[in-house]
Amino acid sequence: MSTDILRKIEAYKREEIAAAKARLALDELKARTRDQSAPRGFLKALEAKRAAGQFALIAEIKKASPSKGLIRPDFDPPALAKAYEEGGAACLSVLTDTPSFQGAPEFLTAARQACSLPALRKDFLFDPYQVYEARSWGADCILIIMASVDDDLAKELEDTAFALGMDALIEVHDEAEMERALKLSSRLLGVNNRNLRSFEVNLAVSERLAKMAPSDRLLVGESGIFTHEDCLRLEKSGIGTFLIGESLMRQHDVAAATRALLTGAEKL
């Protein structure tokens, strides 16, 4: 996403946040988070797959995107969550942004309730209020996009997530962002292979940035991963965890496609 697009997204997000705060005071929202069952352990689920010698997949539930338009016409979050779990995914990522991705909070809640997988709120966060929102909807993890926040806000979002028992996936797409991300506490680092200015996708981005990460960090490859061969290529750089959405969302048999991606097994 170009800087201009990120600016537009931030503008409408700040309007959304102001409207949400007017509807529901922070104290009331915090009370709702206390009504939720405990977080399921997002990072823990990924590490368990890797420890078992398997690829760890964060499988994304995404109806549409700004660049591709409608991706999945027959969009059924609970059915997709069950299919991903059956196919061997470790975690879910659910889009909750409406203007750009046709996402919704209820998609996250419904998907998580339909399976036993931990779920990420995939959205653009600019205020700790949104972290409390995410937890109140059932999310186990938040996304912090370094391209869209400064260091102070990134730390504030991360601290809020940790205080709620959640994990934080820190997303970077270049060396400068990786250096900033490494100052945070989260061990979960996502490398977006999509150039945020040109939209080009290149797995070499993950291969390059992986060299900067200490061994205690869990690296997640994002964007441009379509096949088992892509997974094997990134594994050579120490990346065995992936966030994949569009390529699986377009498949008729999502469970079989997920299994094929993770294991190399032929789709039935």
From Swiss-Prot:
InterPro entries: Aldolase_TIM (IPR013785), Indole-3-glycerol_P_synth (IPR045186), Indole-3-glycerol_P_synth_dom (IPR013798), Indole-3-GlycerolPSynthase_CS (IPR001468), RibuloseP-bd_barrel (IPR011060). Pathway: Amino-acid biosynthesis; L-tryptophan biosynthesis; L-tryptophan from chorismate: step 4/5. GO terms for molecular function: indole-3-glycerol-phosphate synthase activity; phosphoribosylanthranilate isomerase activity. Its EC number is 4.1.1.48. Keywords: Amino-acid biosynthesis, Aromatic amino acid biosynthesis, Decarboxylase, Lyase, Tryptophan biosynthesis. It catalyses: 1-(2-carboxyphenylamino)-1-deoxy-D-ribulose 5-phosphate + H(+) = (1S,2R)-1-C-(indol-3-yl)glycerol 3-phosphate + CO2 + H2O. The keyword Magnesium does not apply. The keyword Lyase applies. Gene3D superfamilies: Aldolase class I (3.20.20.70). GO terms for biological process: L-tryptophan biosynthetic process. Belongs to the TrpC family. PANTHER family: INDOLE-3-GLYCEROL-PHOSPHATE SYNTHASE, TRYPTOPHAN BIOSYNTHESIS PROTEIN. HAMAP family: IGPS_B. This is Indole-3-glycerol phosphate synthase. The gene is trpC.
